Curated annotation (Swiss-Prot):
Cellular compartments per GO CC: chloroplast thylakoid lumen
Record protein name field: Probable FKBP-type peptidyl-prolyl cis-trans isomerase 2, chloroplastic
Annotated source species: Spinacia oleracea
Family membership noted in the UniProt record: Belongs to the FKBP-type PPIase family.
Keywords of this entry: Chloroplast, Isomerase, Plastid, Rotamase, Thylakoid
């Protein structure tokens, strides 16, 4: 939701790209 994929790869896989 604004964090890098390293912090939450499950919530941020393509939305953080």
């Amino acid at each position: 939701a604004g964090l890098p994929p390293e912090e939450k790869p499950k919530l941020c896989d393509a939305a953080c790209e």
